[in-house]
């Protein structure tokens, strides 16, 4: 004998959240022999929305008992419920194709509305929206299904929204590889630390103006990095080598840097830095932060004095990408599972080589080639692009007694 055809029933519960709502609903449903297809729940400011999709024979869905029992049980606990029947029994769809992150301080309704309009105009369906952060920025994640061939248009449209609405909007493929990153490498100057180390050294020689002009031109991609490095280092000739330790002691981490590295270590990432700066200045910080890999330039020192030259291979644009590949090989990590974070034109090749390249408060030349761009001066925003939420960060910190929020001045 053929079993009677089945239909689907969507039950939506809304109201003030309280313990036991889900248990109450499923206790009733179990008495009617329904089969569970899907459950989704969200709670915002203690307001619950619970959706339960079930299938059952048509006579159960159409009869009065199921509706009566569900409504009576839910209203008894003070919540509202709606019940919708459909002849279709839906098949669970393929997962979303992309994820979109929107980060801002603040995210205005106008900004999010602009994102939603561009998404809709391209026929992109929003499958899920969730909050990922309330500090140091507001962060939202949208999982979406993008029609074939619309990927490029989506990225272009959302880049425009990002610029016009002053929010960060990043689009990533929603694939298994997104969850499998294992090695992350940071640039140092203006990324891991605030400011430029070469300018701090130049200040000791009274050449900060000259060096700053050369640095700016190099970071905009207007000068060959190797030549600009040699010109800048030449201004340091004659300085005592003790200035290296002085400058190393003056380095200030980018806000959120410790949180970022602490969290990444908990997740099992290998972490490194690749810098066009100088190894002797960076190494003490790298040791303090327990970094696994360091690549940087070497200042020549003769008789305790800087000669104004570098020795060994120069870590330039190509050298940074080479260092990333070497780190990945040493760590046994495929390049698809690497992340690179930087801010200047000399980071272009490194970000292009990485599985995920993130431009951090970057020059236009780098933003154009990066997979994602961040414009807020908090390094821990990188974690959100890796799928880590602020709640997860602080829950892990709480175990070690490290939860701390610093007041952020208005932008």
From Swiss-Prot:
Span of domain ACT: 10-88
ATP-binding in keyword set: no
Pathway the protein contributes to: Amino-acid biosynthesis; L-serine biosynthesis; L-serine from 3-phospho-D-glycerate: step 3/3
Reaction equations catalysed: O-phospho-L-serine + H2O = L-serine + phosphate; O-phospho-D-serine + H2O = D-serine + phosphate
Cofactor(s) for this UniProt protein: Mg(2+)
One BP annotation, GO: L-serine biosynthetic process
GO function terms (MF aspect): L-phosphoserine phosphatase activity; magnesium ion binding
Catalytic residues in the record: 187 (nucleophile), 189 (proton donor)
Record-listed E.C. numbers: 3.1.3.3
Residues that hold Mg(2+) according to the record: 187, 189, 343
Residues binding substrate: 196, 232, 275-276, 320, 346
Record-linked InterPro entries: ACT-like_dom_sf, ACT_dom, HAD-like_SerB, HAD-like_sf, HAD_sf, PSP, PSP_ACT
UniProt cross-references to Gene3D superfamilies, sorted A to Z: 3.30.70.260, HAD superfamily/HAD-like
Cofactor info, note text: Binds 1 Mg(2+) ion per subunit.
Keywords: Amino-acid biosynthesis, Hydrolase, Magnesium, Metal-binding, Serine biosynthesis
SUPFAM superfamilies in the record: ACT-like (SSF55021), HAD-like (SSF56784)
Pfam families assigned: ACT_6, ACT_PSP_2, HAD
GO cellular component, one term: cytoplasm
KW Amino-acid biosynthesis (keyword) present: yes
Described function: Catalyzes the dephosphorylation of phosphoserine (P-Ser).
Cross-referenced NCBIfam families: HAD-SF-IB, serB
Family named by the database record: Belongs to the HAD-like hydrolase superfamily. SerB family.
PANTHER family named in the record: PHOSPHOSERINE PHOSPHATASE
Subunit relationships: Homodimer.
Protein name in the entry: Phosphoserine phosphatase
Species for this entry: Mycobacterium avium (strain 104)
């Amino acid at each position: 004998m053929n079993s009677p055809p089945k239909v689907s029933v969507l039950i939506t519960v809304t109201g003030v959240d309280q313990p036991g709502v889900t248990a109450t609903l499923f206790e009733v449903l179990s008495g009617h022999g329904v089969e569970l297809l899907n459950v989704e729940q969200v709670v915002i400011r203690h307001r619950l929305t619970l959706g339960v999709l079930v299938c059952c024979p048509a006579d159960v869905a159409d009869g009065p008992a199921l509706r009566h029992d569900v409504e009576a049980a839910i209203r008894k606990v003070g919540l509202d419920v709606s019940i919708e029947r459909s002849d279709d029994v839906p098949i669970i769809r393929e997962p979303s194709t992309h994820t979109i992150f929107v980060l801002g301080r603040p995210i205005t309704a106008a900004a999010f509305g602009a994102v939603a309009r561009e998404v809709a105009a391209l026929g992109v369906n929003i499958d899920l929206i969730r909050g990922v952060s309330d500090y140091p920025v507001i962060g939202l994640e949208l999982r979406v299904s993008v029609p074939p061939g619309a990927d490029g248009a989506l990225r272009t449209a959302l880049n425009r929204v990002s610029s016009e609405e002053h929010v960060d909007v990043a689009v990533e493929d929603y694939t298994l590889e997104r969850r499998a990153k294992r090695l992350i490498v940071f640039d140092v100057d203006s990324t891991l630390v605030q400011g430029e180390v070469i300018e701090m050294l130049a200040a000791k020689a009274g050449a900060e103006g000259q060096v700053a002009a050369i640095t700016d031109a190099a970071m905009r991609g207007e000068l060959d990095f190797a030549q600009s490095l040699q010109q800048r280092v030449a201004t340091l000739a004659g300085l005592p080598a003790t200035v290296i330790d002085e400058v190393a002691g003056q380095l200030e981490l980018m806000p959120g840097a410790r949180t970022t590295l602490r969290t990444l270590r908990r997740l099992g990432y290998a972490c490194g830095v690749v810098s066009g700066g100088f190894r002797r200045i960076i190494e003490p910080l790298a040791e303090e932060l327990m970094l696994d890999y360091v690549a940087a330039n070497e200042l020549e020192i003769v008789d305790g004095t800087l000669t104004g030259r570098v020795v060994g291979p120069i870590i330039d644009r190509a050298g940074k990408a080479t260092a990333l590949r070497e780190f990945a090989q040493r760590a046994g990590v495929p390049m698809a599972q690497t992340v690179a974070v930087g801010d200047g034109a000399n980071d272009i090749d490194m970000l292009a080589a990485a599985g995920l390249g993130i431009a951090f408060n970057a020059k236009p030349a780098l933003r154009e080639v990066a997979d994602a761009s961040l414009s807020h001066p908090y390094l821990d925003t990188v974690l959100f692009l890796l799928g880590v939420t602020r709640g997860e960060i602080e829950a892990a910190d709480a175990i070690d007694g490290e939860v701390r929020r610093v007041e952020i001045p208005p932008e």
